[in-house]
Amino acid sequence: MSRHLSGFSRFLVVWFGQLVSAIGSGLTGFALAVYVFQLTGSAAHYSLVLLAAFLPSLLLKPIGGAIVDRYDRRLMMIIGDAGSIAGVAFIIVMMLLGVKSLWPIYLGSIISSVFVALQNPAYKASVTDLLDESHYSKGSGLMQLSESSRYVLSPMIAGMLMSWFNLESVLLVD
């Protein structure tokens, strides 16, 4: 019985990390889109930032899944998170350097989204490594909760944070 608990406990640690990562990624995508809208007043630019933040990940997940099946899943999660952080860091650096163009926001969002396409399948595939079959349904439910939080909680949190802090500070939360 303790083996089941330790496996589920290990899963909870990974799940919580992914929950924070999903909320952070959603927060970044939404905050950047709102910032671009405030800057340009253009709904088209707002939409393009959201597209850059989410579409590459959606399109590349099948390829990410194939890569994850060939390599260590923990390593793929680490690489995915590191790449996602690099995309956001690129945006922050460009803003701190005073670049007033939209291209760094688009490029950084795309970079971050591409690496999420590696990290997400690795996380989902690791469930079978971390859990016994009797805990699959619990694990699956928690995974769905963390994925949904990206789209439900992130915009609310981003809106609150952006009313108190500047964009760079909000991006650092991710």
What are these regions (language model features)?
Residues W103, S169-D174:
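Symmetry-related core transmembrane helices of the 12-TM Major Facilitator Superfamily/SLC fold
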Residues M1-F8:
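Short, Lys/Arg-rich, polar N-terminal cytosolic tail immediately upstream
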Residues T28, F37, F90-M95, S112:
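MFS-fold secondary transporters
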Residues A82-V99:
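C-terminal ends and interior cores of transmembrane alpha-helices
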Residues G7, Q38-L39, D69-R70, G98, ...:
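Membrane-helix boundary and inter-helical linker elements of multi-pass secondary transporters
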Residues T28-A31, Y35-L50, G141:
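Small-residue hotspots at the loop-to-helix junctions and early N-terminal turns
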Residues G98, Y123-D129, L171-V173:
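Helix-loop junctions on the cytosolic side of multi-pass membrane transporters
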Residues L12-G29, A53-V68, D72-G87, P104-S163:
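Substrate-agnostic recognition of the 12-TM MFS/MFS-like secondary transporter fold
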